[in-house]
């Protein structure tokens, strides 16, 4: 059966994973809330990332920096002066577009990142690119639109009180580099990981949770001596692949690694690679890894006048660390996981089922317990309470057994345990596998060992 992103979105809404933001007031463009099951997946995904990149890696430590920072941070990083999108308006229908995206959709081989506003305008005019909405060619001149959300701190609303919602989590790490290095007695190389909200006032967000104005990032800034001979870029790229394939079970056929060309690189980057995923709307960036040189520490050292170097004990020389940055959006990674997991299967006798084949470690519930008859409710519920001590379990006694199986398939529960009348005699329950629908009998006394073997 063919699947579509529209069907998947409807499924996720109906099953309690994702809801339209501010829905009772007509919604808010590209704003999403995560329901009871969605926030379980989200929290588990963040924990898996944190354990892999921070907690279980002896080189790295964690940080949780503020969303609102001193505006000088964004001046130093270049965001205030250069974090903009080129906008163009259609005079005929009043629609607003990103000029670079209009060109890229017209010809995907064009690298708009190196083009000036004048060059973007010339290309649109020379190639007769039309408004996507009304199919007319009557555009305004391009103007640069700031992507940072601006607000005021305190009771006065003047230039001195202007602050911004952070557009990335990275800068909070850079300005705390010396605090972390000193307090944790770290020597190069070491990394600082962070998970947190970021905000970008983008004009054309879309494709469900792929690109939103409010999003969550999982970023690692890895600091190393520029004279270090180890290829840390390759090391962290390999770690990303290991995480994707072994920790969250992404199929290798669904993603590819693309190294950015020199003219695609950001001004601070020596090297960048994108891990791209085959989303329902085509290939798109899933995860980025960049060699940021010493740009970040250097600009903050220059503006703050604070010494951000590290003293090398072997030669008593100061060094300004270089940085490798693996960065991924939580929601974008969730979209990739949902799209791979969402499956519509045709069964025998014209039956079908919709199943979320989520990785076991990301499923909202690991196991469901259900009684075959109302007479067994008390026994089954007691088993549920016992399993709840060690597993993410759910109890389900509504509807017939077939409907319960389909309901658990739809939300990705790997195993359903059925307590039946035979259980009273042999102390065995029926356990059903989500992906294969295979069933087998197992002793209640062996249930925990069985489940632990599946999840570990």
UniProtKB/Swiss-Prot annotation:
GO biological process: glycyl-tRNA aminoacylation
Principal EC category: ligase
InterPro entries linked to this entry: aa-tRNA-synt_IIb (IPR002314), aa-tRNA-synth_II (IPR006195), aa-tRNA-synth_II/BPL/LPL (IPR045864), Anticodon-bd (IPR004154), Anticodon-bd_dom_sf (IPR036621), Gly-tRNA_synthase/POLG2 (IPR027031), Gly_tRNA_ligase_bac (IPR022961), GlyRS-like_core (IPR033731)
Keyword GTP-binding attributed: no
Binding residues for substrate: 98, 168, 215-219, 325-329
Enzyme Commission identifier(s): 6.1.1.14
Role description: Catalyzes the attachment of glycine to tRNA(Gly).
Similarity comment text for this entry: Belongs to the class-II aminoacyl-tRNA synthetase family.
Subunit structure: Homodimer.
Protein name: Glycine--tRNA ligase
Gene: glyQS
């Amino acid at each position: 059966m063919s699947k579509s992103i529209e069907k998947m979105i409807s499924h996720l809404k109906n099953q309690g994973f994702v809801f339209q933001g501010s829905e009772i007031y007509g919604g808010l463009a590209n704003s999403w809330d995560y329901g009871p099951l969605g926030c379980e997946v989200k929290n588990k995904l963040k924990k898996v990332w944190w354990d892999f990149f921070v907690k279980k890696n002896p080189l790295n430590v964690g940080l949780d920096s503020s969303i609102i920072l001193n505006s000088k941070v964004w001046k130093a990083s270049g965001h205030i002066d250069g974090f903009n999108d080129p906008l163009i308006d259609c005079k005929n229908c009043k629609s607003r577009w990103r000029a670079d995206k209009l060109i890229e959709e017209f010809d995907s081989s064009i690298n708009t990142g190196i083009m000036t506003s004048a060059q973007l305008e010339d290309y649109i005019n020379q190639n007769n690119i039309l408004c996507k909405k009304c199919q007319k060619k009557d555009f305004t001149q391009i103007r640069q639109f700031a992507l940072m959300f601006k607000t005021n701190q305190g009771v006065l609303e003047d230039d001195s009180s202007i602050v911004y919602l952070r557009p990335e989590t990275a800068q909070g790490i850079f300005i705390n580099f010396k605090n972390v290095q000193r307090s944790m007695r770290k020597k190069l190389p070491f990394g600082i990981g962070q998970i947190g909200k970021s905000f970008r006032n983008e004009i054309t967000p879309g494709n469900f949770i792929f690109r939103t104005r409010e999003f969550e990032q999982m970023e690692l800034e890895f600091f190393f001596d520029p004279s270090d001979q180890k290829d840390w870029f390759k090391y962290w790229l390999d770690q990303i692949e290991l995480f994707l394939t072994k920790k969250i079970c992404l199929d290798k056929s669904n993603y590819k690694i693309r190294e950015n060309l020199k003219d695609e690189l950001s001004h601070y980057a020596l090297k960048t690679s994108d891990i791209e995923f085959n989303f329902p709307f085509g290939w798109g960036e899933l995860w980025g890894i960049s060699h940021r040189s010493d740009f970040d520490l250097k600009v903050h050292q220059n503006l703050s006048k604070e010494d951000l170097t590290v003293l090398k004990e072997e030669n008593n020389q100061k060094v300004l660390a270089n940085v490798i940055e693996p960065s991924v959006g939580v929601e974008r990674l969730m979209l990739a996981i949902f799209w791979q997991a969402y499956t519509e299967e045709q069964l025998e006798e014209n039956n079908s089922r919709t199943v979320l084949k989520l990785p076991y470690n990301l499923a909202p519930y690991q196991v469901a317990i259900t009684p075959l008859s109302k007479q067994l409710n008390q026994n089954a519920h007691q088993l549920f309470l016992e399993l709840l001590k060690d597993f993410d379990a759910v109890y389900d006694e509504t509807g017939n057994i077939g409907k319960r199986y389909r309901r658990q398939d739809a939300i990705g529960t790997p195993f359903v345990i059925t307590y039946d009348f035979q259980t009273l005699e042999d102390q065995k329950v029926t356990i059903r596998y989500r992906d294969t629908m295979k069933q087998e009998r197992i002793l209640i006394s062996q249930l925990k060992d069985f489940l632990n073997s599946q999840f570990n």
